């Protein structure tokens, strides 16, 4: 027992470096400090000023469905051709992207999607308790809203939404489907372009991610 405790003490004196001062880097650093490690974060910018700056600030333990999935493949051509699409490429860079694109397509198979979603869910299911543990040590007055998060869609994207809903149901994710009337009751100022929706009542969002 004494040898084991000595080993733990030695491990806790180790110095750990973390690259990136976004929300993930900072949270990892804080948990390591709580375990007794000496931690240094490396980033050429101020904490929270790169990927974590200007994001939606969602606390989303339900977000276990990966981007790599079968239904995405059929949407790629229209994404590339649309000037307003979410996917844009520099055509002179396509050749360099081929290895990445091949890996992306290979991981769009259903068995790969299920494998990724399973382990993402196991990790994300622990996220809210982990955040709560850290937040006990800081003043969060007015910085976090506990109002849930709602998604809406049209019939045009119903097939993809059904895939997401069914996958989350299989993983045991808590979700509540909404009719157009229920969406209107929750958000009467939202233009009624939608045909359905889902709400995650336990989800949260940050009013100012950088300040947190």
Predicted regions: what is each one?
Residues 1-9:
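Short, Lys/Arg-enriched N-terminal segments with co-localized hydrophobic residues
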Residues 11-19, 23-24, 48-61:
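Accessory recognition modules or surfaces
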Residues 14-40:
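N-terminal Rossmann-like FAD-binding beta1-loop-alpha1 element of flavoenzymes
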Residues 20, 43, 153-154:
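Short beta-strand/turn micro-motifs composed of small residues
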Residues 34-53:
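Glycine-rich FAD pyrophosphate-binding loop
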Residues 46, 66, 156-157:
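Short, glycine/serine-rich, charged loops/turns that create anion-binding
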Residues 54-122:
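Glycine-rich active-site loop/strand segments that organize a redox cofactor
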Residues 98-211:
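Rossmann-like flavin
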């Amino acid at each position: 027992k004494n040898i084991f405790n000595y080993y733990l003490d030695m491990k806790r004196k180790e110095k750990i470096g973390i690259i990136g001062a976004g929300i993930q880097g900072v949270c990892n650093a804080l948990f390591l400090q709580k375990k007794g490690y000496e931690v240094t974060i490396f980033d050429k910018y101020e904490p929270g000023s790169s990927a974590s700056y200007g994001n939606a600030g969602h606390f989303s333990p339900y977000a276990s469905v990966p981007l790599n999935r079968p239904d995405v493949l059929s949407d790629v051509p229209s994404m590339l051709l649309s000037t307003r699409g979410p996917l844009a490429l520099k055509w002179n860079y396509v050749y360099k992207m081929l290895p990445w694109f091949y890996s992306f397509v290979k991981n769009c198979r259903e068995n790969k999607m299920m494998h990724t979603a399973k382990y993402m869910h196991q990790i994300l299911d622990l996220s809210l308790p982990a955040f709560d543990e850290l937040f006990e040590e800081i003043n969060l007055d007015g910085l976090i809203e506990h109002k849930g998060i709602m998604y809406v869609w049209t019939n045009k994207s119903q097939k993809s939404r059904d895939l997401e809903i069914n996958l989350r149901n299989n993983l045991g994710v808590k979700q509540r489907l909404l009719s157009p009337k229920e969406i209107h009751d929750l958000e009467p100022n939202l233009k009624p372009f939608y045909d359905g929706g889902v709400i995650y009542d336990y989800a949260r969002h940050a009013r100012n991610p950088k300040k947190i």
